[in-house]
Amino acid sequence: AEMALARGQHGTSRMVSLGERERVATLGFRGEALPSIASVSRLQIRSATGDEGGWEVAGPFHDGVAPAPCAHPRGTTVEMRDLFHNVPARRKFLRTEQTEFRHIDRMLRRTALSRFGTGFRLSHDGRVVRDYPPADTVARQAARIADVVGSGFVEQAIEIDDDRSGLRLWGWLGQPSIARSQADWQYMFVNGRPIRDKVVTHAIKQGFGDVLHHARQPAYVLFLEMDPAGVDVNAHPAKHEVRFRDQGKVHGFLSHVVSQ
């Protein structure tokens, strides 16, 4: 029943009341993604919760097809084929296959860092490109970070964890010796959501002080946890930028923790 519901517009919405818009604690909350994808592609969802086999549902969200039994290991597979096959005007705006795959790969790597408890496998042209098993220990989390960011980062990073005034910052902070000429080793997550925010970036760099050359970029994989009511995740259409209710408090906290 839930699989059929997942394809319906707003069927997977996490919102029960309008007031929850001020306390968004999930990556998606409107329930629009799957039906939107299904309307412009051939979408198949297969899922199983145990060893008794699974269920699958395929086709556009409006055709009323019920889930059918299928063989599937525990977990969920969402397969999308022939994107924009029914909207050729949109299809011509797609970049090359290589470029589009890079976008997918980048998104998967960010997601893999924010969801250590979930395993991810990415296949391309019939070949497994990324395979991240669930990371349920600190050692396995470090191993995943090494796979995603690079072993050079993990070997030169310091584990941090600080909690005060309703804010918690934890993760891996690269030492100044591995600072980069560009910000390609910067991964920041707020309540599990990957972001790029000027307040956060400035605070972290300020925390390094004089030990980091102004032209160099710090390397980090950091997680900020806070009350969802204290951050607006709808500040930007792409959801990459956020707006903090108390920017000064967040900035000061981040800068202080990094400086320690």
PLM features per residue range, with description:
Residues 1-260:
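N-terminal phosphate-binding caps/lids of nucleotide- and nucleic-acid-binding domains
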